[in-house]
Amino acid sequence: LCLPQADVVALCLPATNATYHLINYERLLKFKADALLLNVGRGNAIVTNDLIKAVKEGHLGGVYLDVTDPEPLGKDNQLWELRDTIITPHVTGNYNLERTINNVVNIAIENINRFCNDQKLLNVVDREIGYRENH
């Protein structure tokens, strides 16, 4: 990891054994003091208590969290009180958009047809690695 040189570290990670608590206190100490940490993947990629400690000690320039651990974040969680920290609600997939719902339904219909015809399914997630491999 190139943490000491990075101005911005953006986490867009799936929840897997390999990414669980990837960013801990030891790694946070390697960040530049003015570095920004963004997490838009899964909350458990960061050890929450370690992040709180590192920010309070001034080891980061700012934090943006679209995801947290736990999620939802309790009203008394210390993350809400951190300086230079922005927390937004994690809304995956924009299911409020009609085109998103249509996409999901169309993929499901296509996969039912493929399954019935012994064809390869679309968007299959590899349970070992925790995400869809590009084909």
Model-based region annotation:
Residues 71-135:
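C-terminal helix-to-coil terminal segments
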Residues 1-78:
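Rossmann-like adenosine-cofactor binding region
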